[in-house]
Amino acid sequence: MVTPMSVLAPFLAGLCLVALPVSTHSVQPEPDRGVWRTAAPAPTKRTEVAAATLNGKIYVVGGFEQPGLGNLLNLAITASVQEYDPSTDRWTTKASMPVGLHHVGIGVTGGRLYVIGGYTQSGLTVWHPVATVYAYDPATDSWAERATMPTARGALSVTVHEGKLYAIGGYDRNANSAAVEVYDPERNAWTSRAPLPTPRDHLASATAAGKVYAIGGRVNGDYRRNLSVMELYDPVTNRWARAADLPTARSGITAAEVGGRIYVFGGEGGGGTFRENEAYDPVRDTWQTMAPMPTGRHGLGSAVVQGRIHVLSGGPTPGGSFSDLNEVFTPPGERMTKEG
């Protein structure tokens, strides 16, 4: 978790199957746990970002930048938006958000990118929760404000199901929110749905097999109180149910869906940051440990292009740390599909 002091501290301180010649035992191949590679780093080091894919390009928005003289007045909160093109391995700076935000929710539908909630600066605090919704149009490289979310909160998670954006959980700096509020871009209107059974913040969410999943997180902003709980929501019945727990209790995580499976990356806890990469199969309700991240991080974002998951930015150590990392995970089967 980033605190004002941790942000300002720099200022204040001045498969291989081996064939044996003869054997009476069969040799089992190593399970395919996916592979990692490194892509072009982002132009700036950041943490507590959000990321999403739109029209084959990846957008990284908001968060905290490394403190410097240029961002002292806004306590290092950034409104910047950076676009990454995997086909060229290059970054481009796009139109900034109307206001600097961190710990936002993000989703893409109808050809636009939506940034929902989060925290912003108010006086000397960087933890003022907001209910704002901003829509980005890549055709005009511009932002527009949309109908505000009913519940102001940050450290929430957003996922998309059938063209609607589900804003789940979060923290208003007093208590965890159980709010599940659904935004319909066509109507520019919000609807409240059944509350999250386990209120939490710094969670991840994803949509798979027609269900919405709320994964991990923490209690009242305290990463020493990480959760492994995962709950699934059925939009048809408007009911929540318990699913198999995340193997590693963690928060400050990110999740992405590829090939019907949900991959959960990173996070932080009292002992440091996590390299864990765990995959959930909604058909079997089971988890599998995948190849760990090259660099453990929290406050990171993820986005998928052509079956590959880009895991972006975030802090390598708990609290106020920053990175420009762009590490790319290819899940099992995707390498064969895309490259072979």
Write out the residue ranges for each language-model feature:
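Bacterial N-terminal signal peptides that target proteins for export
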Residues: 1-11
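Residue-level detector of alpha-helical transmembrane segments in integral membrane proteins
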Residues: 3, 14, 22-24
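Bacterial N-terminal signal peptides
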Residues: 9-19
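Kelch-like beta-propeller repeat domains
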Residues: 22-340
